[in-house]
Curated annotation (Swiss-Prot):
Residues linked to a glycan: 5
InterPro entries documented for this protein: GPCR_Rhodpsn, GPCR_Rhodpsn_7TM, Olfact_rcpt
Keywords for this protein: Cell membrane, Disulfide bond, G-protein coupled receptor, Glycoprotein, Membrane, Olfaction, Receptor, Sensory transduction, Transducer, Transmembrane, Transmembrane helix
Topology within the bilayer: Multi-pass membrane protein
Extracellular face of the membrane: 1-25, 76-97, 161-205, 262-268
tRNA-binding among keywords: no
Predominant location: membrane
Protein name: Olfactory receptor 5K4
Cystine bridges: 97-179
The protein's role, per its UniProt record: Odorant receptor.
Family, per entry: Belongs to the G-protein coupled receptor 1 family.
Amino acid sequence: MARENHSLAAEFILIGFTNYPELKTLLFVVFSAIYLVTMVGNLGLVALIYVERRLLTPMYIFLGNLALMDSCCSCAVTPKMLENFFSEDRIISLYECMAQFYFLCLAETTDCFLLATMAYDRYVAICHPLQYHTMMSKTLCIRMTTGAFKAGNLHSMIHVGLLLRLTFCRSNKIHHFFCDILPLYRLSCTDPSINELMIYIFSIPIQIFTIATVLISYLCILLTVFKMKSKEGRGKAFSTCASHFLSVSIFYICLLMYIGPSEEGDKDTPVAIFYAIVIPLLNPFIYSLRNKEVINVLKKIMRNYNILKQTCSIANLFLIY
């Protein structure tokens, strides 16, 4: 019991960006702006998809859930990081560590499966357009989305639960800007071999399965596109897949670089910033700027807003006179 209490009472210090005290204010402003734009962009995209009925198709349902998970990822990491810029102690408890890692792992794992389902959706749309509504029914879409969330939740709970078997009696300084699981293992005085084994057992198969799904889907798409005789058809197919392929490439390159072997946590910081903070910022723009349907819906909303604004102005004039 004493050992368990010692583990649960542990507190850690997030070193973060303390090596750059002269840039503290600038970094706070930059990351605050990124956080604000990320939340507005992702939650705005979610609202747009679920309010506009014609966007309630499998592709946009997956996209809306991806945006929701990007918001979750940003919320898990950024607020505590911003607080620590002006905090004297920068302390985080084990409970906070577990919660932070749980939501981050949930978001990243669910993202992996959602990106794979989006690749499969594009494969069906381009390679089997006549059977699309049969092969990608709303029921299947909901099941795939629910499955992605369940897998993310289970994966997170396993790793967070295994943290309870560790005790921390070494340095309590985490050389990172958030409470990631690998830096925690370095501080454990209990052998974390079982925890590390669970990463290999669960995380690596998830990566292999989702990456293989994406690669096979795009290989089939490329073979189908090259067989198309119409240049317009090829252009439309490439345009449909370009944003998703760009997002997938950035996500997996950063993720694979981050989970690669590293002895010091601070060496992971630049890559972690990119995959935990920058990617959630970029995704709404990657998917929206090249998407005619989303742009048309935005234009429609802006037109309605301008009409409403003009109507209110005219009504105010009548009230004045």
